[in-house]
Amino acid sequence: KHTTAYEIRLSLVGSEMCIRDSPSAGACGGQFTANTMACVSEVMGLALPYSSGAPAPYEDRDKYAYESGKQIMDLIEKNIRPRDIVTRKSLENAATIVAATGGSTNAGLHLPAIAHECGIKFSLDDVVEIFKRTPYIADLKPGGQYVAKDVYEAGGVPIIIKTLFEGGYIHGDCMTVTGKTIEENLKDVEFNENQKVIRPYNKPLSPTGGVVGLKGNLAPDGAIVKVAGLVNTFFEGYARCFDCEEDAFECVSKKGYENGEVKVIRYEGPKGGPGMREMLSTTAALSGQDVGGKVALITDGRFSGGTRGLCVGHVGPEAATGGP
């Protein structure tokens, strides 16, 4: 098959878009899954203060890598292990920062999984309850204007933790890898008023978190949706159902749908997929066709942290186990 001039131009445009969006090494800049879990590692006390947000090309990375190595040796000597740091309270802190930053819906999977590994009961229901009471304060992509580099230059993850702590949303008595508590680590941290990336807790972008949980007849065991940046949080339309993502993507790529539809992708959960892969192709195609606010998507699969538009995921029970 010969490559057409159109395909070459499309490839070049795509390459330029990638360079502009992710101009260097490291994770994508928005508050997607990587940066969400980086914030989580710091607020849980598993990473040194400021270390989780330094952009990949910055020389600060070398300093944090060296200091992290030293701290690991100190923790080994003192017999302090991750399970001594990961507690119910630290997991609540983690859910708080996810909501406050409009983080990835994948945190709804990762946090209960971390808890399970440590023998702690902490379910999606617990995560959702924290989402409900946490203010959304970080104006980060994909729902906002800024990226992780902007957070770091505004003062880093500690200023997010600081204002949340001042508002009573963070447990300050949790132990961290520094050997000190969250509150002790925040002692010399001052909230930077001369930036627009992070709002103080009492002047939020919205009074509740950028990620919310849903329950209903389509999701008796719950579902999750990122609402950060959503203009319209009410949607009603006819359902068009697919039993795998490939079929849904083919429909979208051929524009075989109408605005106002609700696309339902079933059998993409942990058992049905199997593996619960991201519905990235379909959501990206909808976004690329600029219908993110005109078409909704519901699935028992999951999404990329960069998903935009009204996309409800993690529907439980999944279709493969008899879910709706």
Task: Identify the residue ranges that each predicted region occupies.
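Residues that form or flank phosphate/diphosphate-binding pockets in enzymes
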Residues: 7, 106, 274
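Mobile "lid/hinge" segments at catalytic clefts and subdomain interfaces of large enzymes
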Residues: 15-16, 20-213
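Acidic-residue sensor for enzyme active/binding pockets
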Residues: 7, 42, 278
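Ser/Thr-centric signal marking residues that sit
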Residues: 4, 33-36, 299
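Feature captures the catalytic cores and cofactor-binding loops of soluble hydro-lyases/lyases
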Residues: 123-324
